[in-house]
C-alpha cells in the first residue's frame, strides 16, 4: 500500500520517482522510530495487562518496529495476517475472533490508539472501549490520517502513552 501512496503523492506534487524508490519507501516502515515514550509505557503496562497489536503493516515491518518497543506482545495481528487494512471491519472482526479463542471477551478490550479514522471510529462500531492517545493535541487536524467525519466516542483521552501510565499509577495509589 505505501509504495502506491508514495507514487501517487509524488505524481501529485510533480516529483519523479522510480519504481525502486516506491518499493524502498514501502519497506522503510520498520526503520521508522517509535514514539519516545512507547517502549517504557508498554513495558509498564505489560505488568498489568495483556497487550495486543492490531497493525496496518506487514509482518516483516512489524517485527522491525517491535524490536524498538522492547516488549513481548500477547498477540499481534497485522494487515498481512488479516488481508485488509484498518478501518475495514474485517480487521476488528479478525482481532475479536482471535481474542475470543484466547478467552478474551470484547468487554475486556480497551482499544488504545491515536487515529480517530483508522481505530476509534471502527472501535465504536464494534462496541469496544477506547483510549485516544492524542499526540497531536497542540496541532490542528488529524496529521497523516483522514478526518473521521463525526468524532468517535472515547472513554479515555491522554496526550501520550506516558500520561496513560501516570493515570494508571495514580489509580493504583488511590485504591
Write out the residue ranges for each language-model feature:
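A metal-dependent, Asp-based hydrolase signature
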Residues: 1-23
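Catalytic-core regions built around general acid/base machinery
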Residues: 37-48
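Acidic-and-aromatic substrate-binding clefts and catalytic sites of carbohydrate-active enzymes
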Residues: 32-35, 84
Amino acid at each position: 500500500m505505501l509504495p502506491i501512496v508514495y507514487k501517487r503523492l509524488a505524481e501529485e506534487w510533480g516529483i519523479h520517482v522510480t519504481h525502486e524508490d516506491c518499493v524502498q519507501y514501502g519497506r522503510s516502515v520498520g526503520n521508522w522510530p517509535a514514539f519516545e515514550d512507547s517502549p517504557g509505557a508498554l513495558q509498564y503496562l505489560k505488568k498489568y495487562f495483556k497487550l495486543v497489536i492490531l497493525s496496518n503493516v506487514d509482518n516483516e515491518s512489524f517485527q522491525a518496529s517491535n524490536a524498538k518497543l522492547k516488549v513481548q506482545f500477547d498477540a499481534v495481528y497485522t494487515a498481512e495476517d488479516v488481508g485488509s487494512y484498518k478501518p475495514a471491519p474485517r480487521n476488528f472482526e479478525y482481532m475479536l475472533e482471535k481474542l475470543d479463542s484466547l478467552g478474551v471477551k470484547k468487554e475486556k478490550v480497551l482499544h488504545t490508539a491515536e487515529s480517530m479514522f483508522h481505530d476509534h471510529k471502527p472501535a465504536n462500531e464494534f462496541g469496544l472501549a477506547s483510549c485516544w492517545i492524542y499526540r497531536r493535541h497542540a496541532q490542528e487536524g488529524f496529521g497523516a490520517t483522514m478526518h473521521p467525519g463525526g468524532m468517535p466516542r472515547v472513554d479515555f483521552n491522554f496526550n501520550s502513552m506516558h500520561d496513560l501510565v501516570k493515570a494508571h499509577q495514580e489509580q493504583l495509589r488511590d485504591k
